Amino acid sequence: MEFGISRKFAFLVQFRFLNCGKDSRGAEGGHWTERSEGSGWSSSGTPDSLVLTGLKNLQNCVSQDKPVCTLFSVPGKRTKPVKSHPKYKKFKNWHLTALIFFSAWVLFSAGCASQKNVVSSTQPEVFANNAEFYASTVTFKESFINLCFAGDIMAHKQNFSMSDYSIIWDGIRDITGSADLSFANIETTVDDFKECMSYPQFRINSDYVNEAVKAGFNVFSLANNHTNDWGLEGIKSTAEWAQKTADATEKSPRPVHFSGLKLDLIESGKMNNSGKDISFSYFEVRDWKILFVAATEILNRPEFSQYMNFSKPTKKVRRLFAEQLRNLRASHECDLFILSLHTAEPEYVFKTEMEQESFYKTLLNEACVDIIWANHPHVVKPWTVVKNSAYRENLLALKTKAISGTHGSNVDETVNADATVNVAESVLSDSKLIMRANGNTISGQRWDPKFNAPETLRDYTGDGLLLNVTFSKKVYTDSKHKKLFQTIELKSSQPCYITTYINSKWQFVIKKLDENFISELKKSGNKVWAEYLKSRKKIMEKTGENTIWQ
């Protein structure tokens, strides 16, 4: 039966009736029979059947002269059974009359609703204290996605001189390979027909970055200040590798995605208005739609910037960039909009200026970006979870509107905080994420660790962050499986600090900066590295997560 009763009488819809028999102590008397597990409703029972059951139970108790329990209870509170009383018989008829009166009133309030309602066993948790919602057939399907965000993949001489690139990633491939999407910024050009080059103009052969792909990384940013280190030739060779990798993995269980270069423009070689557009990657992971854009606000040289997503860090250009991003999302329905931004901030500086923070706020609120993944400083900065303070209120409003629109009930308008929301197109998010810099994932910058001074600024370049985040998506549908709205919630964010360790063979490899690795070093007799990384671990853990509400 579908209900349209007002909220203030909702508690009357949640019944708990007694059955006669022996209680838990073996004494003859009344005890509770729960008609629902936690929610106040069973998956198959209807309100009128509960009323009839209650009538029958009460009649049995009265006829058998058994003690009667309180028939109605407020959700979440249990009323203790009334003990037998000598004067009970004087009141049994009154109890029966009261039950009949309230039962008739509840059934009357239900109106001429259908008798076919069967409530799904998967009901939204926000409905738990609003019993009238349980009479609705609105249900949801929930799914999850796990994302891993790394930092910069650098290629100094110490890195590309190694004979086996695979061992670089052995220490973290269990993390990067298990996430649905693992993100990294490739801060070098890729060219198989040229020799590898280190700072200041980076170039690497594809076998170096292919090992990162094999380690599980499958989403790459190609837009940074080194993208045009080798001019248009370097841009083209990098684009060719990216396209080849994307094509080769397209039908694999783990396809690889790229953003940052304007591949169509690079292939055609034509200078036209397309150079003003943003290139992006738009793909699906199971039932999740992802929109990914990589852009840079800084270049080491001005030439050929039209072949990449380059946005100058001026107020005017930033406004236009935010507008472009907003329009891009409006034309591409997605569950998560992720922006990789190579910032124009100074390197090796931990503080983020207020102007940059203000730009991040614009990207989240006006450009409709969900996740900002920034890099360039080569050190780890704090990251921020931005909570939507109106989320619960708006979620309740959407659910109320959905039920009202589906069942025609006149729900109290005070809970409908957003009456203008188009329920069928609504996507409500509880949190957004700002990563200001995840440091170096691999580099040769800390080639001379200061074991006696681990707080040295240069030593920060040898440590990085893998931030693992899990999102939940709930798609709410009506009884005809028509989508009403959906929610996106950030369920968890787990940091894993990493370090570039130089082993006895002068190989630069990534290790987890944790107690296990430090203990391993101690057991092997490498006390110098053990003590150094113990100090580095304490330093890195000061760089953590903070939460703000807006």
Name what the model sees in each region.
Residues A179-D191, F220-N225, L299, L325-F350:
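Short acidic, glycine-rich surface-loop motifs adjacent to enzyme active sites
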Residues T122-Y134, F140-F144, M154, S161, ...:
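A short C-terminal boundary segment appended to hydrolase-like catalytic domains
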